[in-house]
UniProtKB/Swiss-Prot annotation:
Its cofactor is Mn(2+). It comes from the Archaea. NCBIfam families: NurA_Sulf (NF041033). InterPro entries: DSB_repair_nuclease_NurA (IPR053461), NurA_domain (IPR018977). It comes from Saccharolobus solfataricus (strain ATCC 35092 / DSM 1617 / JCM 11322 / P2) (Sulfolobus solfataricus). GO terms for biological process: DNA repair. This is DNA double-strand break repair nuclease NurA. Involved in DNA double-strand break (DSB) repair. Probably acts with HerA to stimulate resection of the 5' strand and produce the long 3' single-strand that is required for RadA loading. NurA and HerA together stimulate the end-resection of six nucleotides of a linear DNA substrate. Processes linear double-stranded (ds)DNA probes with 3' or 5' single-stranded overhangs or blunt ends. Has endonuclease activity on single-stranded (ss)DNA and nicking activity on dsDNA without HerA as well as 5'- and 3'-exonuclease activity on ssDNA. Binds ssDNA, dsDNA, forked and bubble DNA equally well. Its EC number is 3.1.-.-. Mn(2+) binds at D58, D133. Homodimer. Forms a complex with HerA. The gene is nurA.
Length: 339
């Protein structure tokens, strides 16, 4: 089968190349003027970055379907860094088994995000800026019907009791509690740190700038090369996604600014969300400061946290084996084929 595909590739090479050229040419004709209008080249002021400290947080997770359920492990780490180096601040993690269910992977992701947000709330005061991986809107998630929860279950949210939440027997209720917890934590982070939190995305599907079939970040990577930043986009949080508890009311009234930036010539474009209305002066200050801790156009503290929390193939296999040996040791009748 694969040989047939290779043969087709050889036969169609020129046709595919022409298709790529035609798409690029079409895009250039359609939006080059907009790119020129919306992209601002900028020369970094390196003096701004000398004393700035960044707290960066990222998380990692994996889940393995097994006959007994979904074995999962999640972790999160906060680091602090400046132009002299990066060191770890805090780590947290959870490991367990969820019963099989359609939303098991979603619960794993929500649990990882809760660990990230908890570390950000705790360690954010140690730096000048907090760097969070991913977009602000994704972290906020979707509205949860709070009528399904008892007062005791809502108390789990206010106490940030993760162990209590993942002990809930009803999987759907557990998922919704995790969603609500993440909204609660985002609101606390915003109340505490406001515009000092930068939500950074390497990948974005946003099309607010150019309105083409291609994400804005792709267009900017295709048609710009120099260090710079895009036109600023002011947005409101979608109130239809905000749950109805008073502790997260701040999210209902909140504006935030989105912009794209390239921190080094020829490197990747990243997306940045920041709470409030900011102007180009603030964007330039952010670029100046981020450039002091960036490698190949990406903030190194965030990259360090990302690399530290990744579960390698070896990590995954080791965890699965440990879970299996633990079951055998503690439950003698447990057959090996169950895991």
């Amino acid at each position: 089968m694969i040989r047939k595909i290779y043969d087709k590739l050889v036969e169609s090479h020129n046709e595919i190349k022409n298709q790529i050229y035609n798409i690029a040419n079409y895009l250039k004709q359609e939006i080059q003027d907009k790119v020129n209008e919306y992209w601002n080249e900028y020369v970094i002021n390196h003096e701004q970055s000398e004393t700035c400290k960044f707290v960066a947080i990222d998380g990692g997770s994996f889940g393995r379907p097994m006959r007994i359920g979904i074995v999962y492990a999640v972790g999160a780490e906060s680091v602090i860094g400046d132009n002299k180096g990066v060191k770890t601040l805090s780590e947290d993690g959870q490991i367990g088994i969820f019963k099989p269910g359609n939303d098991a992977q979603e619960r794993i992701s929500l649990l990882m995000e809760a660990l990230e947000l908890s570390l950000a709330l705790r360690d954010g005061s140690k730096g000048d800026y907090i760097l969070m991986d991913g977009s602000l809107s994704k972290k906020i998630g979707n509205k949860v019907d709070i009528q399904q929860f008892s007062d005791e279950e809502l108390k789990l949210i206010r106490n940030v009791d993760l162990n209590g939440i993942i002990s809930i027997k009803d999987e759907r209720k557990m998922r919704d509690l995790l969603m609500l917890l993440n909204q609660f934590l985002v609101s606390k982070i915003i109340e505490e740190y406001d515009g000092n939190v930068l939500w950074i995305s390497k990948v974005s599907r946003g099309r607010d700038l150019f309105g083409t079939d291609y994400p804005d970040i792709t267009v900017l990577e295709l048609f710009t090369e120099k260090r710079g930043f895009s036109k600023l986009i002011i947005k409101n949080i979608d109130i239809e996604k905000i749950s109805e508890i008073p502790e997260i009311e701040v999210l209902r009234k909140m504006e935030y600014t989105t912009f794209y930036t390239r921190l080094d010539n020829g490197k990747r474009v990243i997306r940045v969300d920041i709470v409030g209305r900011v102007d180009e002066k603030i964007v330039k200050e952010i670029m100046d400061r981020l450039s002091g801790v960036s490698i190949k156009g990406y903030p190194f503290p965030l990259l360090k946290a990302h690399m530290d929390v990744r579960f390698s193939a070896m990590d995954r296999e080791k965890i699965i084996k440990l879970v299996g040996s633990k079951l055998h040791k503690d439950i003698e009748w447990w057959p090996s084929q169950f895991y």
